Amino acid sequence: MTVAGVHRIGLIFAMLVASATSLHAQRKVHTAYSVTPDVSVRLIASVGTVQVVGWEKDSVVVTGVVAAGSQVSLGTPGAGPTRGLKLFVESPTEQAVREGSLTVRVPRGARVWLKTGSSDVTVSEVTGGLDLNVVGGSITVHGSPRELNAESMDGAVTVDGSPSWMRVKTATGDIALRGGEDIGASTISGTIEARAGEVERAKLESTTGAIHFALALARGASVEMETHSGPIDVQLSRKSPPEIDAATVTGAIENLWSKIVPVAGREGRGMTLALGGGPLDGRIELRSFKGKITLRGM
């Protein structure tokens, strides 16, 4: 056998040993609780991925794997339905964090409070309340919870639904929304993408990231968008034109939505654009220090 062949066999053997060691080092998690339909679940999880799934049963079921040596505190199931649960998983190393994953099934009407470090979090079919806090991972929500508070420092936040009340915050992560009744979203350098839905009230803020808005306006809607240097791009239907108040300090305004031409601001700096609309067609306020504001039709 050649020297290259010997090295190849050695590499394969090492990979098999590493894989077997990793599997052996993992610990399975499985526990279930009888709970009330509106149970409050608090989970601190130091694992790679967390899935929260709403279902019709009045029970909470936690399954998954964690690395050996992890601290796991999942409590003891009681004799009757409980109104509150506190769950805790702490992995010993960063590598151990990546190896762990949890799936938590909760009643649809549950309120879930979740805090993780670098986990990627996915939530689906929960109609109660969600409070999600992640440092380095992403957050994805499918469905329309009653309340949603989601914060990720570096990861993206995607909301595929229309929560009644929503607040989303990132530092560098992008934000993607599909509408809702009362929306608040802010980022420092990430982008905010809001499209393919309807909104009643919204306040979107970014420092350097772009804002792209293409939501339909509910009757009497109120929308505010503000950036420092990030561009603002707004797409609107021409069928029910809202009142629009747009202004920049040094940035440009381009109106491709109507024939009204923006005018120079005070002292020749920046631009302003004021458009009248119907009393019930909504109002949009756009502000940027030096970012460009663009209006266009849908």
Where does each model-flagged region fall?
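Intrinsically disordered, low-complexity terminal regions
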Residues: 1-298
